[in-house]
């Protein structure tokens, strides 16, 4: 299967999982990116079952609204039974690198209040050690250079994310992103805590403190379900 076919496969599997496990009338948390879009498209066929969704980005909001799915502000919602999102990398413990699409902060917020985090990914995203994919850090613009120096001291190579026009990429929150290359992340939870404590960091794209509960992994032989123990 092509990568796009694998994304569609896990998007449908996630919709099937949500339809089978989430009660009618619930509000669902939805992530950002091409794999999350496949989930939205698959979920749309059964949208009447749900009150709506909480979105993690402006792009996801637009996708949901295109399908006629009501989008709620997180402040309006008491609970989210499930959050479904992709990952740039996921390891055997359920820790992830996320933020390739630039929505890491809102993704982390929505994930943090969900009961179950379902990661959907193709098999290429499953790794033994995180770090081959550059680690995104959302930063307040005035702190960009200072954060870059701290990254270098860790042994990483900081690269300011830019648009195709060559100007800094700006997140939905009005901040910039540093992509860190060259890290081998053996202890993602500790590194997440460490980087998040730097002044000027909005959040780092490590999802270890709140990792996935479940991964639906698209392979050439079908969808593999990986469950992670949390505690």
Swiss-Prot record:
A single GO BP: pentose-phosphate shunt, non-oxidative branch
Catalytic residues, chain numbering: 107 (proton acceptor)
One Pfam family in the UniProt entry: Rib_5-P_isom_A
Pathways per UniProt: Carbohydrate degradation; pentose phosphate pathway; D-ribose 5-phosphate from D-ribulose 5-phosphate (non-oxidative stage): step 1/1
Keywords for this protein: Isomerase
GO molecular function: ribose-5-phosphate isomerase activity
The enzyme's E.C. designation: 5.3.1.6
SUPFAM superfamilies from the UniProt entry: D-ribose-5-phosphate isomerase (RpiA), lid domain, NagB/RpiA/CoA transferase-like
Family matches, as InterPro entries: NagB/RpiA_transferase-like (IPR037171), Ribose5P_isomerase_typA_subgr (IPR020672), Ribose5P_isomerase_type_A (IPR004788)
A cellular-component GO term for this protein: cytosol
Keyword Protein biosynthesis: no
Catalytic reaction annotation: aldehydo-D-ribose 5-phosphate = D-ribulose 5-phosphate
Amino-acid positions noted as binding substrate in the UniProt annotation, renumbered to this chain: 32-35, 85-88, 98-101, 125
Similarity comment: family membership: Belongs to the ribose 5-phosphate isomerase family.
NCBIfam families attached to this UniProt entry: PRK00702.1, rpiA
Function according to Swiss-Prot or TrEMBL: Catalyzes the reversible conversion of ribose-5-phosphate to ribulose 5-phosphate.
UniProt cross-references to PANTHER family, sorted A to Z: RIBOSE-5-PHOSPHATE ISOMERASE
Subunit structure: Homodimer.
Descriptive protein name: Ribose-5-phosphate isomerase A
Source species of the chain: Paraburkholderia phytofirmans (strain DSM 17436 / LMG 22146 / PsJN) (Burkholderia phytofirmans)
